[in-house]
Amino acid sequence: MSLDKEIHSLKKLAAQYSQQLDLTHLALPNASTIVHPNIQCAIYELMFNEAAAWPLPPVGYRTRVLKTIISRIEEGITDPEEDELNSDLIETWTDLISLPKPSQIQQAQQLTYIKYTAPTTTTSQDPQTVITSESRGLIYSSGTTGFRTWEASLHLGTYLSTPTGAAHVTGKRVIELGAGTGFVSMYAAKYLRPQFVLATDREGTLIENMKGSKARNGLGGEFGVGAWEWGTPLGYPTEDDTESITREDLCFDVVLGADLVRDVSSFILFGILGSTGLMESRPMTQTYFLCFSLRFMTFLITTRPKSSFSQLHYGTRRLSRRFWTLVGYGVDYFADNNRFKAVCLPYESPQTENQTGFFHETEIPIRTYRVTR
């Protein structure tokens, strides 16, 4: 591989680093390549230069990554008189090891900015990025899983980054349920040219978190945030959230959802959706993304244009016991019992080693369902 191509390949490494992947998953150049002065310079500019690389990961993560990089460079040194460490990298390392380090508990509970980069299909394509505020440790103390972006959300984002996926959103009025960090909604609003996107969640802290992320991503009136406790009517966002969107325009064509459930019993969601105004009148489509283990589910729904937020309320319905005990009944069976038609779409995310953005594990398959009624 030529030096220019090697430098270009560092953009993938920088995207993985900004997403704060585990060190074992970083696509580091080999020792004979990383020792080259131009490669070291590019690594500094893309990953550690505070004036150019924003947002930077937490100090602890940067320190671990840079330590690994320096060790790899040292492995590649064959002529001490010719090969040397980049002075900017050395200075950065010196600064990092002198900074105070929070405890592991503090690190786990602190929110940090994470930058996600969309998959790229050409070398000249400008990167599409979304910045969220997350803590992958807060799920244990907060009682919600919404403080991090999970694999199924990244799978959904990957699907939406394709021409087929983007077509579901372009020009449409979109709402996301259980938005969590807002990753999917913000990506759709920022790059897929929808008419409007509303991200909803039940947790007040997550709502405030998404409002802050809205500003960091430069989003305006095309993106709003609202609260929805399932089992109650969906409240209208405040004027500050909707900005130029009028109340009459707050209806939608597409509903997105990712990682909404954690076990098969939560297929009650079909019953919830089936008893709302969301499912009235003309035929509509739904697409469900489902982990093979049934621990997480995502979906995309297209509904009639006149469905408004005031119609979003539901009555619970009791499940048959077999839904709680027999995984084999799954989406198809439960959809049929709520008068849906579920068809599995032939879409899979690229294997982890072939991904160019929205990096996520693929060991547990996430199946894509198109559900119509």
What do these predicted ranges mean?
Residues 1-373:
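S-adenosylmethionine-dependent methyltransferases
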